[in-house]
From Swiss-Prot:
Protein task: Molecular chaperone; assists the folding of proteins upon ATP hydrolysis. Known to play a role, in vitro, in the folding of actin and tubulin.
Main location: cytoplasm
Keyword list, A-Z: ATP-binding, Chaperone, Cytoplasm, Nucleotide-binding
Protein's name in the database: T-complex protein 1 subunit zeta
Gene this chain is encoded by: cct6
Signal peptide (residue range): none
GO cellular component, one term: cytosol
Keyword Cytoplasm on entry: yes
Residue stretches spanning the membrane: none
Subunit structure comment from the entry: Heterooligomeric complex of about 850 to 900 kDa that forms two stacked rings, 12 to 16 nm in diameter.
SUPFAM superfamilies with a match to the protein in the record: GroEL apical domain-like, GroEL equatorial domain-like, GroEL-intermediate domain like
Compartments reported by the entry: Cytoplasm
Record family assignment: Belongs to the TCP-1 chaperonin family.
Amino acid sequence: MLSLLNPKAESIQRAQALQVNISAAIGLQDVLKSNLGPTGTTKMLVDGAGAIKLTKDGKVLLTEMQIQNPTASCIAKAATAQDDATGDGTTSVCLLVGELLKQAELYIREGLHPSLISDGFNLAKNEALTFLDSFKTDFEVDREVLLNVAKTSLSTKISSKVVESLAPAVVDAILTIRRPDEPIDLHMVEIMKMQNRSASDTQLIRGLLLDHGARHPDMPKQVKNAYILILNVSLEYEKSEINSGFFYSTSEQRERLVESERKFVDNKLRKIVELKKEVCERDPTANFVIINQKGIDPLSLDVLAKNGIMALRRAKRRNMERLQLACGGVAQNSVDDLNPEVLGWAGSVYERTLGEEKYTFVEDVKDPKSATILIHGPNTYTIQQIQDATRDGLRAVKNAVEDNCLIVGAGAFEVACAAHLRNKFAAKEVKGKAKMGVYAYADALLIIPKTLAANSSYDTQDAIVALQEEASEGYKVGLDLKTGMPFDPEVEGIYDNYRVIRHMLHSATVIASNLISVDQILRAGRSSLKEGPPQ
């Protein structure tokens, strides 16, 4: 029938279509499987231009790899959507989808209809979500617990030595910008990079770091007790917004024209200098700093330097809001109503030079609502890895604070949920052949602890049996990657995010259910409809 509708369309039907989907899902699973956990391996990505990227991050891999297979591409998009929504769980989604399809295939080969397995998957998912709510651990915001959350997330991406220095910076950044009863805005945490020193020198700045310095050699490079004027005012002569022209016939006329143009800017400078003198008369130890979003011409810089004012021009727009949150003060679009109340304050503002780059640090602020994480590293590969890990760590801590609950990690939830689904839910509450789908779902969940064991060079069967024996006695047990034996993850401070696990169960189940329900794959785009030349 399809050949009558479109002679050039390609079609794969029934068992063959299912096999194509299962093979694609398992293929993607095999690529990502070795990345999972702290002992996972790193992938090297080489693009068409020969640029190299080293990463363990599932989202980076799925985004950078050019996936041609439509089924694998579908899974990859869902997994990256998981990262966009929760900040983690990309690799876990791909592993779980692949394992769900692999387990489903075993029952389909025995003659069970895919729709019955799909029904079982949905029943198991709903029960797993209910079990997740009973399995979670409630907690009040505590720095030590949040440090463990950050370390759990970061250790899957970077080395343990770097984790020890980066985790406190990530947690303190979240606690700095957090406000009661308000959502946490991660845009208020700036991530800056410096290619120098070692990765373990990464630090948190409770303030702001600007990637440029003062533009005049006579300006002070370091000031204490700094009053900061945040401006969005042009301190240079600008062309008018409408087309206009001026004509002069003598040099005197030209001089008067230049003088009137200069007077326009000088009037603005006079008001700024008057404000500076007013502030310094009140507090003789005070210094004055201007951070302007627009330009400052050389003559204006000279005037400011003579008055001992440190001035930065063309600050990035995104930093203007962060600057107000970090230092206080109000950004001014005009110099007409300047007064000391609009000024921000910082205990220290200083400039540092690294190679040809200049950086300005704004530190020791009173009540920062914005912060900067400064990443150090010996090369671009290391810095990029730390940057990706930092973003994931910030999301993990943010999720924990907003959820007010955690899930013990190291595969503990998956082992406990699999036992619950198989021994209690399927055995007592599910009737008919849908029970097979629940069994398949329970077995598929074990892919997470199995992969953790395999990546740590332990026998997967020994590890799973030991975990199941401990879990059957009612304990929350995970896999100790150092010994390969069961242990209590809560004692070691290994936690996963509640919303990450919840989203993973939703996403993986929906994708797997849809893929096993496919009985025909059609390739019939516009290009296949083009007729050849007439004979």
